From Swiss-Prot:
Assigned GO CC terms: small ribosomal subunit
CDD domains according to UniProt: Ribosomal_S12
Upper classification of the organism: Bacteria, Pseudomonadati, Pseudomonadota, Gammaproteobacteria, Enterobacterales
Organism, scientific name: Buchnera aphidicola subsp. Baizongia pistaciae (strain Bp)
Protein name: Small ribosomal subunit protein uS12
Similarity comment text for this entry: Belongs to the universal ribosomal protein uS12 family.
Keyword tRNA-binding applies: yes
Gene it is expressed from: rpsL
Length: 123
C-alpha cells in the first residue's frame, strides 16, 4: 500500500474506460446517409453474406453499419438511423441500422420480435 507521501508525489491513476461506439458522440442514435450498400463474409467458423452499408453521419464520421432482418430497401443516398451494437463475426462493424425509421423499412411478414425490426402489430 502506498504511503501518504507517495500519494502526494504522484496521485493514483484513473482507470480508462474504452468507448465502443465513438461515432455516436454519447447520443443514443445518429442519422446518416448511405454511401455504399454491399455484402461481406463473416469471420472463420461462420459462412454467409451479411448485408452492411457504409454511412456518413451528420457529425462527419464515416462508419460501417449492419442491416439486420430478412431483406431491405436501402440503396445509395438512403437516409437512415443507426444505433450502437457490434456484430461479433464482422470485424469493424460496430453499429446497427434501425429498421422502420426514416428511409429504412421494417421487415416484411415479421410476427415475433417485431419491435426490433420496425413492424406494426398485425390486425
Amino acid at each position: 500500500m502506498a504511503t501518504v507521501n507517495q500519494l502526494v508525489r504522484k496521485s493514483r491513476s484513473r482507470k480508462l474506460i474504452k468507448n465502443n461506439v465513438p461515432a455516436l458522440n454519447k447520443c443514443p442514435q445518429k442519422r446518416g446517409v448511405c454511401i455504399r450498400v454491399y455484402t461481406t463474409t463473416p469471420k472463420k467458423p461462420n459462412s454467409a453474406l451479411r448485408k452492411v452499408c457504409r454511412v456518413r453521419l451528420t457529425n462527419g464520421y464515416e462508419v460501417t453499419a449492419y442491416i439486420g432482418g430478412e431483406g431491405h430497401n436501402l440503396q445509395e443516398h438512403s437516409v437512415i438511423l443507426i444505433r450502437g451494437g457490434r456484430v461479433k463475426d464482422l470485424p469493424g462493424v460496430r453499429y446497427h441500422v434501425i429498421r422502420g425509421a426514416l428511409d429504412c423499412s421494417g421487415v416484411k411478414s415479421r410476427s415475433q420480435g417485431r419491435s426490433k425490426y420496425g413492424v406494426k402489430k398485425k390486425k
